[in-house]
Curated annotation (Swiss-Prot):
Membrane topology: Single-pass membrane protein
Role noted for this protein: Part of the high-affinity ATP-driven potassium transport (or Kdp) system, which catalyzes the hydrolysis of ATP coupled with the electrogenic transport of potassium into the cytoplasm. This subunit acts as a catalytic chaperone that increases the ATP-binding affinity of the ATP-hydrolyzing subunit KdpB by the formation of a transient KdpB/KdpC/ATP ternary complex.
Transmembrane feature ranges: 14-34
Species of the source: Bacillus anthracis
One GO CC term, this protein: plasma membrane
Pfam families hit by this protein: KdpC
Cell compartments where the protein resides: Cell membrane
Protein name: Potassium-transporting ATPase KdpC subunit
Family according to the record: Belongs to the KdpC family.
Subunit-structure text: The system is composed of three essential subunits: KdpA, KdpB and KdpC.
Key words, A-Z: ATP-binding, Cell membrane, Ion transport, Membrane, Nucleotide-binding, Potassium, Potassium transport, Transmembrane, Transmembrane helix, Transport
Any GO molecular function: P-type potassium transmembrane transporter activity
Length: 193
């Protein structure tokens, strides 16, 4: 019995010590450093409106359906962050073909003057997470005609807005040139006022 206690005592102490270190101390230190060094990112990269209300995050896409606004990528999870993921259909899967065809049909309804051959792939396919907040500058540009027609904003103004909101690859190496759809639509709202 004494031998069992002598073996269990250090096991319990080590377990408790690591529980406190890994479950409490380490997360608090990392959170403190993140808040001090990069507060915006640590808080979720939130985007605020003119009234200082949170309206979204630059990291999570939103579903814009109003034809006067720029639309983002298709989301098989309807932009529900708790359900992040995609169907990940293989290119040979008939369900993928049906879903892309449906996206193309919706595109044609809203953008009848833009040939389907000019539609960038990111407007009719899912991202891996289903929550991608960004589109390519070309994906934004092909929507300019529709938005200009519905809002009476000159195409040149919309082209400049896209140019102003375009972000390059991180460190010039990682990722693609992209436009955040939420930021783009906030800029569009300011122009419409």
């Amino acid at each position: 019995m004494a031998k069992k206690q002598s073996i269990l005592s250090p096991i319990i102490r080590i377990t408790f010590t690591f529980l406190v270190l890994c479950g409490l101390v380490y997360p608090l230190i990392v959170t403190g450093i993140a808040q001090a060094v990069m507060k915006d990112n640590a808080d979720g990269s939130l985007i605020y409106n003119d009234k200082n209300e949170v309206i979204g995050s630059k990291l999570i896409g939103q579903n814009f359906t109003d034809p006067r606004y720029f639309h983002g990528r298709v989301s098989s999870i309807e932009y529900k962050a708790e359900a992040s993921g995609s169907n990940n259909y293989a290119p040979s899967n008939p369900d993928l073909e049906k879903r892309v065809e449906k996206s193309i049909e919706e595109w044609k309804k809203q953008n009848p003057s833009v040939p389907v051959t000019e539609v960038p792939i990111d407007l009719v396919t899912n991202s891996g997470s289903g929550l991608d907040p960004d589109i390519s500058p070309k994906a934004a540009s092909v929507q300019v005609e529709r938005i200009s027609k519905l809002t009476n904003i000159p195409k040149e103004t919309l082209d400049q807005l896209i140019k102003d909101q375009t972000e390059g690859a991180a460190l010039g190496l990682f990722g693609e040139t992209r436009v955040n759809v939420l930021k783009l639509n906030l800029g569009l709202q300011k122009i419409m006022k």
